[in-house]
Regions:
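Hydrophobic helix-and-loop "lid/oligomerization" segment in the mid-to-C-terminal part
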Residues: 43-200
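Short alpha-helices
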Residues: 1-58
Length: 200
């Protein structure tokens, strides 16, 4: 078995599509649609720092195939009223550390009220805290059985090293971990707060 790791790519889909492009492999419409979808989501709609001219060249290569790009965006980002209300109730629970790390801690009861799986709350809600003015690190803690799922994001700091400290990992500015309990989540919050404090 072989493993290909190249952290300079914004996404695995970008890496795969670039392989296909470079090697002259045939990419059918369905494959192009799937790869383009991964490129869009993992690049934050082409907004993250990892996006480069290579990203856009790969996107252009995929867009030469026949699929509905607008349908992808509609499926990913257009929401019904129930979903918007769910996000509003989530956002009402946002709290802040001393150094402005935004976070939400969702108990099992909170998850049940939202009518979503713990994974959907954890991964699906974390970016509702993105783009808050003055916030450069945000964390989403979600109870799942006897564990706590944690998603970390930042627009400025290397939060991956904090995730690794707690047995997790990911990317420089988008990482996660599975924690033992709420106390461990609070310890992680202190580490995130210290990370921001040391950079001020």
């Amino acid at each position: 078995d072989y493993e290909v790791v190249d952290s300079t790519y914004e996404s695995c889909c970008g890496l795969i599509a670039d392989f296909a492009k470079t090697l002259g492999l045939k990419v059918n419409d369905n494959a192009a649609k799937a790869l383009y979808t991964g490129l869009v989501t993992d690049s934050g709609r082409f907004l993250y720092d990892s996006v480069s001219s290579r990203t856009h060249n790969i996107a252009a290569f995929l867009l030469e195939r026949n699929f509905d790009r607008n349908a992808i965006y509609r499926n990913l980002y257009v929401e019904d009223l129930k979903s918007v209300k769910r996000k509003l109730s989530f956002m009402e629970r946002i709290k802040f550390t001393y150094n402005n790390v935004a976070y939400v801690y969702s108990t099992k009861e909170d998850v049940a009220k939202m009518g979503l799986s713990p994974f959907s709350v954890s991964r699906g809600m974390v970016n509702t805290m993105a783009n808050l003015k003055g916030v450069h690190v945000w964390a989403n803690f979600t109870e799942d059985g006897d564990k706590v799922l944690c998603e970390l994001r930042s627009d400025s700091y290397d939060i991956n090293r904090i995730a690794k400290k707690y047995g997790g990992g990911g990317h420089l500015k988008a990482s996660g971990a599975t924690l033992g309990d709420r106390n461990e989540a609070e310890k992680m919050l202190k580490d995130l707060d210290k990370l921001v404090e040391e950079s001020i």
